[in-house]
Amino acid sequence: MEVSGESHSGPSCSSSSRDGSGVSVSKELLMAGSGGRGGIWDRLFINSKPNSRKNSTLQTVRIERSPLLDQVRTFLPQMAQANEKLRKEMAAAPPGHFNIENTDETLGQVIQMDVALFEMNQSHSKEEDSSEENSQDSSEESSESEDEDDSTSSEGEVTIDNIKLPHSEDGKGKIEVLDSPASENKEKQENK
């Protein structure tokens, strides 16, 4: 494409010549890969020539109603009613009645869960970087666990044998029921 004296029918662009050859580099770049139709130029403008592939017969279809949507629509009013009922009960009840930290024995069984979350699978680079931190943390934890062990070993709650530290080898959790009615009954029978 030469610039000398030609009038371009397409959109105007700045021509830059290299070594006086008169080749419009920007025009060539815009026309590249076009196959003579305008190339990227047509895609840059919103009101460019419509692409024949985009004008294929697309139809709007109706999607069936989701049963999940019906369930949500019935659940939300029930939730709103329950919230309103709870607000009224909270206004009428004495202060502290709905405090979740106050548990009475009359309320029934209470499940206390102490959960520790930590990442099990770490990448090698993270393990190498955190190995120093882990050694410092483990020394601090061991000193803390010894202090706790001295104070609680008489009660039999936490010992070196039953303490579970993150990144241990066995990887299995231990569930222990504390202060259950069955264990209280056993203790009473043993004391008799």
Swiss-Prot record:
Residues bearing Phosphoserine are S34, S66, S180
Cellular component, GO annotation = nucleus
Q: Which UniProt keywords apply?
A: Chaperone, Nucleus, Phosphoprotein
Q: Where is this region: Disordered?
A: 1-39, 118-192
* Record's compositionally biased regions (Low complexity): 1-26
Subcellular localization, per the record? Nucleus
Q: What GO molecular function terms would the record report?
A: box C/D methylation guide snoRNP complex binding
- BP-aspect Gene Ontology terms: box C/D snoRNP assembly
Give the quaternary structure.
Answer: Interacts with NOP58, RUVBL1 and RUVBL2; the interactions are direct and NOPCHAP1 bridges the association of NOP58 with RUVBL1:RUVBL2 even in absence of snoRNAs. The interactions with RUVBL1 and RUVBL2 are disrupted upon ATP binding.
Task: State its role.
Answer: Client-loading PAQosome/R2TP complex cofactor that selects NOP58 to promote box C/D small nucleolar ribonucleoprotein (snoRNP) assembly. Acts as a bridge between NOP58 and the R2TP complex via RUVBL1:RUVBL2.
Instruction: Please give the name of this protein.
Output: NOP protein chaperone 1
